[in-house]
Structure formats: structure tokens, C-alpha cells
Amino acid sequence: MEYKITKEELGNDWLYSTLVALNKCMAEHGLPLYVVDARARDVAMKLMKGDEPKRRTEDLDVAIAIEDWQTFDDICKTLENNHFKRHGETQKFFYKGVNGDLDFEVDIVPFGGVAVDEKIGWPPEGNPVMSVKCFQDVMNEAVTVIVNGEIEVKMAPLCGQFLIKLDTWNDRNASTDKDAEDMLFILKNYLDIQLLYQKDNVPPDVVTFDNESLDAIIWGAQWLAYDISKLLTTEHLQFYADLASAELKKEEKSNLIYHFMKYYGNSEMGDFSSNYEPCRQIWSVFVKIFSKELEERKKQ
């Protein structure tokens, strides 16, 4: 699938200039440029006429598929030779522009053969560690975005963006709940976007529009869970089914459900206890649809 967006629609000259420079650098290594995380979400919402996120991002996260750290070092050198300044020995760069008048933050996330046990440990010490478990599955379904008719970038589909956020939440939920906020934002927009662009492809026997007692967000969860279930390998599908199931078993003690409750809405004076049931129901949908897909694969 291919989308087009103009520089004006992108709405950020620094971002555009950074994408142009990154695209040039990655092309030198024969690598596609994958845009992920919050910036991918923001661009997707512009392309698909979704809601504007309340929490805007001021940086850019990109992913690259590489086999070893030597390739990563070579890419870093190319970036530094093209007006990117590296922050220490980390994956963080700042694009300074040809004239040195920019300062746009970029995080480079490697995945693929460079990962060990589907995790990235930054050299030389091998930390911090982050999961890239779902990255290959997601990037296999990446959509193409042509920016201003000049540059081509790959972007995780919305269902893949949700999954990357779930991975990130699983890594750091003890210290932050912002990944749950991002997941919930995608979920709240998912049904409307799918009905706008995929209205003739409603998953059969999955999205229960005939059950009018359900909130629209549950229909969105059904569709989102279905799309994710078709994107994942069986091993990864089992992992995320187990993750969601384990959180449901914790009931009110679940961090995942609690974080969703905080951002679900309908709370007064900081009391969001009434959000427990709809948030529990959302994750029950994921477990049900993931489990159904796993059972169907066993029969094949």
C-alpha cells in the first residue's frame, strides 16, 4: 500500500529536511528507512484524517534492519558525514542541517540479525536493553509513504504501531504509562479509520456490529486484534496472547489495565475506577481473537 503526503501536509520543515538527509544516508547502504513510534502515528493520522494526538512528539524514531554492529557503526559514520551529530555512543543523533541551523533529534533503532533473543543491547556494555520482538513481523507489512514526491520511506501500519507500543510498554511499564496512552489513542481511532479505508473488508465473524450493547471502541479492538493476529508469526502471536492473558488474571492489580483506565476517559477528580470493566473487556477481546487464530493455525 502506498500513500502520498506533501511537505506542507507534513507540517514540519525540520522533520522534512531530516527525512531527506536520512533517506540519502540509508540509500548509500542500500537500506530502506522505516519510520516508527510516535512520529509514525502522527503521520498516519494526517494521512488517514484521524484525530490529532494530545501529546505531540518533537523527535523522530527510525528503524533499520541490519545483521551486525559493524554495519551500525558504518551507518553512524555516514550520518556524521552528513550533518548528523551523535550524542555520545548511543543511538541518538541530532540533525544540524547543511547550514548548521537545525537541531532535530533522531533515534536509530536496529533490528534483524543484530538482535540477540529478539532484544537489542547497546554496545559496548550491552545495555540498556530493548525488545524488538515484533519489528520484523511489523516491517514485513510496512506501508510506503512518498513525501513531497521526492523521498520514499516505509512506515509501520497502525496495527503494527500498536504492537510496537505494547512491546515498549512491556519493557518499561514500571516507570512510565505513556505507552498505554499511545496504544489507547490508536485504538480509539482504529475503527473510524478502518471504516473509511477498509469498509469493504470488515473481518468476517470478528467485528460484531450486530451487538449494539458494545461500545464502538470494542468493535475497534476486535478489528485491531484481528489485524495484529494476521500479522504475527505463530510464536509471537502466542507470546502476546500469553502477555495479555497474564495481565487479565491480575484483575485490578494489572498495570496494563490500570494504565488504560487512566487514559480511557470518563473519570472525575482522578477517580477512574469506573473504567475498569471497559478496559478489561478490551484486553479480553485481544486474548479471545489471538487464541482463536492460534487454534485455527493448529488445524492447518
Which role does the model predict for each range below?
Residues 1-300:
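Compositionally biased terminal segments of proteins
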